[in-house]
Amino acid sequence: MVTLGKADLILVNGQFHTVDRENPVAEAVAVRDGKFLEVGTVAEVMQHHCDGTKVVDLKGHTAIPGLNDSHLHLIRGGLNYNLELRWEGVPSLADALRMLKEQALRTPSPQWVRVVGGWSEFQFAERRMPTLDEINDAAPDTPVFILHLYDRALLNRAALKVVGYTKDTPNPPGGEIQRDANGNPTGMLIARPNAMILYATLAKGPKLPLEQQVNSTRQFMRELNRLGLTSAIDAGGGFQNYPEDYEVIAELHEKKQMTIRIAYNLFTQRPGHELEDFEKWTDMFTPGQGSDFFRHNGAGEMLVFSAADFEDFLEPRPDLAPGMEDELERVVRHLVEHRWPFRLHATYNESISRMLDVFEKVNRDIPFNGLHWFFDHAETVSQANIDRIKALGGGIAVQHRMAFQGEYFAERYGIEATRHTPPVAKMLETGVPVGLGTDATRVASYNPWTALYWLVSGRTVGGMQMYDHSARLDRDTALMLWTQGSAWFSSEQNQKGQIKAGQLADLAVLSKDYFRVPEEEIKGIESVLTVVNGDIVYAAGAFGPLAPPAIPVLPEWSPVVKVPGHYRSAPPQAARVGMSVAHHCSGPCGVHNHQHDFARTSEMPVSDDNAFWGALGCSCFAF
């Protein structure tokens, strides 16, 4: 035990679940210079107290290592976060449409209202998509773009006008512009079979100026901190160009304003010129180059465009191009020669089989020899291919896309086919490294607790039971994959992922005891105190006075001003107390001015503290 080091921060009287088998549970931790100094009993930790030490009493709260999303499009998502209205977790379509209408009134020309990913029609009480008529009624004049998973986008008439889609606009390759009986676009764009039409249309929208992109990225990181996230591996992404789209995150790193650690992969943007991109980048970077907050992590998730098999389960499985292997081999051979780690998007087992043929061929000539590489997604990977991945020393980064698409998958392939899609338990039994993540923001939600709920319960966000007991994970295992497991995918397994002396001091103190609450309550967990590098970056509730200063949202009309991220449901009693304190017009009943007759006939959810208007703090907002 270290007895001489003095701590900068001490947290006591917590239930620290450390993900360290040698010391699985602790009462207290001491932090110095951004790393854990001591993890143990209160008496052991308080030996490191000195006059300058900040001491925080956790009063029995559960604490865990900071969560690490092994596949998040944080850099791209940050640039756009302040532009986007979030429907994540919203319980009814009626509330979602009210949110849309309110934001349309606040959004100035020429800006759009954008709902970009993170939701499913099955999460709504109505269990359906919005109609184009409903969207046009909610926003008759302001352009609206609503992205649903990888399968479709809905545009109102104003958006069709500004993007220029008319009767004479041809369907692009791989996509369809739905038309009415007269051949005019209806506003529905369909990915058939890939999502390029959706992303290309979204890219036509106005961008934020640089100053507001910086603010937007900081807001997104603060939202992730609220959910207990402290690290992410950025998977690049379509229309995320290097170096121009990395200027904002580089500025935040230089100014020491990052509150999420990022390891980033480089994603080629030029079909037919992928090898040229990687030849240039391997001359510029060494894997691991950077700091503990912002470091290079290799190539991917796109290595060659011919290897992309988008997971639109409303459409048949796509077959990859016949020449894919030759193109992929040239890139992988170059990466292995330069000892660059790589990741590759692969949804279907059929794609994975062909990709593994390439990897095995390269390995015979240039041994991988411990090089970290992995598949992303792998929903339908077979046991035979899991064995092949293990033999090559690879891993699998799994995301909760099936929590949003399980119903569609079951409709196409049958409920039995969903039972092990993806087969996470089998991956672990085989000994393959597994890390967990979200693939946010354009498809699934960035909320790690939605993913943990899915893994533990086996249910989608719509409540469909996908997995039986054999395919579900216990809570400790699921947490391990979100912490220590994900660290392998940035080659940082000895630096982060555990509450352990010598590791980076990243942790989250939870609003509820993840290990004991009913399964349905897992998805509502948040952090009440998030620590990154030994610094408190987020605090709420009883720990609110410890929070860093709030960052004003820019621009002032941003959806984040009114809807600050993922839908959050407060405990009923706490919410009602908060409403009556903040708004004297409300009492214990939670109804504005006690106007029960009006409330009973109103369409507004005036007394529901978990509905849209109530979530703003008071039903006054409804009138």
Model feature map: region roles:
Residues 79-81, 164-166, 353, 407, ...:
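Short, function-defining helix-loop hinge/capping sites that tune catalysis or transport
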Residues 116, 147, 399, 508-511, ...:
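Residue-level recognition of conserved beta-strand edge/terminus positions
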Residues 172-173, 280-283, 437, 494:
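Glycine-rich, charged/polar anion/phosphate-binding loops
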